[in-house]
Amino acid sequence: MSRVAKNPVAIPAGVEVKFGAADVTVKGALGSLSTALCNDVEVKLDNGQLTFAAKNDSKFARAMSGTLRALLNNMVNGVSKGFEKKLQLVGVGYRAQAQGDTLNLSLGFSHPVAHKMPAGIKVETPTQTEILVKGADKQLVGQVAAEIRAYRSPEPYKGKGVRYADEVVVLKETKKK
């Protein structure tokens, strides 16, 4: 059995887990998430906890039990607490402004960049150089943050660009004569 799958997932109050024929749905205060179940993994709900076990002793079944446990743990945390990624804009004239479900970016290009947010993702701009991406789906929050960062990733000489708040950009030394 996977070491990850040995730990059960606690279901907090206000979170509802429903099993379908081949999928599981988790509903909570921040929305509803769903994922497909693996045929080789047995998932049980008892006493407010989800437990995971491989149905057979194959390497694939053991691996998928840990993977499914991690996915369901992220879903439970997402619908109860939510996830967020913080981005910073570093550079002269770099600005961000949230308007509804669109993020307008001014990143030194000859044109403004408008990034439309997918369903389930909220974006906030506390200041003109900070972006907060929030949502219940951990994978989608990270994907949207990576897409925003990809418009202008930090360059290695001055560090200008869009970076994660906890990212450390190692600067290169300029060429000396």
Curated annotation (Swiss-Prot):
In the record, biological process GO terms are: cytoplasmic translation
Molecular function (Gene Ontology), one example:
structural constituent of ribosome
This protein's UniProt keywords: Ribonucleoprotein, Ribosomal protein, RNA-binding, rRNA-binding
Look up keyword Cell inner membrane and say if it applies.
no
Gene Ontology cellular component annotations, sorted alphabetically: cytosolic large ribosomal subunit
Q: Name one Pfam family in it.
A: Ribosomal_L6
**Protein biosynthesis in keyword set:** no
- Top-level taxon of the source organism: Bacteria
This chain's function reads: This protein binds to the 23S rRNA, and is important in its secondary structure. It is located near the subunit interface in the base of the L7/L12 stalk, and near the tRNA binding site of the peptidyltransferase center.
Query: What family does the database annotate?
Result: Belongs to the universal ribosomal protein uL6 family.
UniProt xrefs under HAMAP family: Ribosomal_uL6_B
* Family matches, as PANTHER family: 60S/50S RIBOSOMAL PROTEIN L6/L9, LARGE RIBOSOMAL SUBUNIT PROTEIN UL6M
- Subunit architecture: Part of the 50S ribosomal subunit.
Q: Name the chain's protein.
A: Large ribosomal subunit protein uL6
Tell me the organism: Chromobacterium violaceum (strain ATCC 12472 / DSM 30191 / JCM 1249 / CCUG 213 / NBRC 12614 / NCIMB 9131 / NCTC 9757 / MK)
Give the lineage.
Answer: Bacteria, Pseudomonadati, Pseudomonadota, Betaproteobacteria, Neisseriales
**What gene makes this protein?**
rplF
